[in-house]
Amino acid sequence: MTKANALFDLSGKTALITGSSQGIGFALAKGLAEAGAAVVINGRDKAKLADAAEKLETGGATVHRLPFDACDHGAVKAAIDDFEASVGPIDILFNNAGMQHRAPLEDFPADAFDRILNTNVKTVFNVGQAVARHMIKRGAGKIVNIASVQTSLARPGIAPYTATKGAVGNLTKGMATDWAKYGLQVNAIAPGYFETPLNAALVADPEFSAWLEKRTPAGRWGKVEELVGAAVFLSSAGSSFVNGHTLYVDGGITASL
């Protein structure tokens, strides 16, 4: 193995990815496993989680399943503490759990606002805190929060989602500010528009797809596999002095008007 390859090798590391039974989370789990990490996949649907685990194991990955509700602070702490005690340390955390709800802001349901806030922001706090407490004791750890282009930009009909992703970007900075002194690196990845279950309605909309392809300098939707390079970098020794940064993987959409 060359020095360059060793810098990004995740062999011997264990990575927890929340919301990883499908979409971006599954792609991240697959990519981290291919870089050498054992992966801990998470979700509330045990059947989907089992299916995801089978697919990853077929590809040769070492997989653990941890089906907790990331919105439940007590359940998160119990699950993380039990895993650390019975299986081993979590070296890398990807806070990926998220949801979307589209509606005009003046008609946006209050209960949907609460759900999106809990799912997109509270989960980052819940899981980040539970895992960081163990990382701090060891003096090392990598946390990567999944933000969005909506961390910086807004679109009609998704104002609460935009607010939550802005919060993720700033919570990332806050985590880095508090935890860097303990040897942790906390960063975020902000995906652009990718072909995922969360974006299924948009992918199926010819008018939106045409607008997106014109708006994005790269001229196309992103493929989830294109997030893996950023994920491996921020999980590896190659990012040892990168902290509090949000890395946009968006085909250039936030760089242009």
Task: Map each language-model feature to its residues.
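Short C-terminal tail/terminal secondary-structure segment
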Residues: 2-6, 153, 232, 243-257
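Short, small/polar-rich loop/turn modules that mediate ligand/substrate recognition or access, typified
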Residues: 180, 185, 242-244
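Active-site helix of classical SDR
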Residues: 128, 164, 172
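Residue(s) in the substrate-gating loop at a strand-loop-helix junction
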Residues: 148
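Substrate-binding pocket helix/loop in short-chain dehydrogenase/reductase
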Residues: 104-105, 112-117, 143, 208, ...
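Conserved mid-core segment of classical short-chain dehydrogenase/reductases
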Residues: 77, 100-114, 137, 157-160, ...
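Conserved glycine-rich cofactor-binding loop
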Residues: 14, 21-23
